[in-house]
Amino acid sequence: MSSIMYHDNHLTDSGKNMSSGLSLLAYVTVMVAEEEEQRSRLLAEKREESKCKMSFFYLFPRKIKSSLAKRRYTQQNPNGASTCSSSLPDLNLIPTDFETDNLQNPCFDEPMVCDEEQRLKKGKSKIVYDEDYDDESEKKLFDNLNGASTSSSSLLNLPCLEPSTETKDVPNPNYQSSSPSSCLTGKTNRKRRAVEQRKSGKVKKVKVSPLPRLCTEMPEWIFQVMRYMNADAETPRLIFERTLFKSDVNSNLSRLLMPFQKLIRNDFLTPAECRAMQKDEDNDEEDDENIGVGTVLVNQRFQKWGLRFKIWAMEKDSGHGTLNYTLNWGWNDVVKSSSLKVGDKISLWTFRCRGVLCFALDTE
């Protein structure tokens, strides 16, 4: 009997040890699962943070060029869709939290990153963000852009905007006229002619050109855009003002030209962006796929688009040409959404968001 009781007690102790071991194993399993879950969550957060930081670094799609037959069909059917409309996705169709009746509180948090499959279909115009650059390469680039050659065979050899070297002759205050009465005689003759013109009714009206606007106040809505986009802490720059012509709103052209000679300032590009816009001399392709910088344009209605900013050479029959900056690959969408028309006065301001070149389009 005693041996049986001892055996039962021995089994009870073994069962207790087994139960304790199972409990410990279950505890360890739970701890490992929790650690794995925490590790996965941290990796997901880091991946999301990295994705957010790189939200502007994406490739813009190339515009699909339609065939000649399709272009003729579009011209014959003006009610049809434009063949030059941008192939870029409309960034304003993405639902966001700021699309409310109150336009004073916009928010610009919608993603602008495309998946890998779409990236393969896009062109090579991209956002440039490169702080490390070669000083010698930069100097060579700006020397090329400022070259004074009149040959039209190369893009960079066309005449560019150069600082004016004209000087006005300042009269010498110590100069004495050889004829003491010459000044008096001139004044008398002018007065006599003025009296005769008033009597005959043939008074010429002097055309006074309006004074240029030396200082343009930045619109308040640009401050709001920069604040909600977390833009870089720098003052926006007014680079271009223009009254729109027919070519600027032509859907078949789909671009806004900014001649170098008409720019208010031309110091808003980084050296990396200048290199990206420089034409590859060895590239014989007609599309110039390697030229251009991806930018973001925002209008007064707090709408934004991804456009391409590049150098555009306008060649003339005389052999000379002009250099222009141009915004395309989506300009038709900007014209339509902003209700732009011939005669509208526009101004372009530049700022940067996380180092990316952005434009603010203001209309009067």
Curated annotation (Swiss-Prot):
Name of one Pfam family that matches: At2g31720-like
InterPro entries in UniProt: At2g31720-like (IPR005508), B3_DNA-bd (IPR003340), DNA-bd_pseudobarrel_sf (IPR015300)
Regions recorded as binding DNA: 260-364
Lineage: superkingdom: Eukaryota
Molecular-function annotations in GO: DNA binding
PROSITE patterns cross-referenced by the UniProt entry: B3
This protein's UniProt keywords: DNA-binding, Nucleus, Transcription, Transcription regulation
Compartment list: Nucleus
Location of the region described as Disordered in the Swiss-Prot/TrEMBL record: 148-202
A cellular component term, taken from the record's GO annotations: nucleus
The keyword Transcription regulation is annotated on this UniProt entry: yes
Regions that span the bilayer: none
Name of the protein this chain belongs to: B3 domain-containing protein At5g38490
Origin organism lineage: Eukaryota, Viridiplantae, Streptophyta, Embryophyta, Tracheophyta
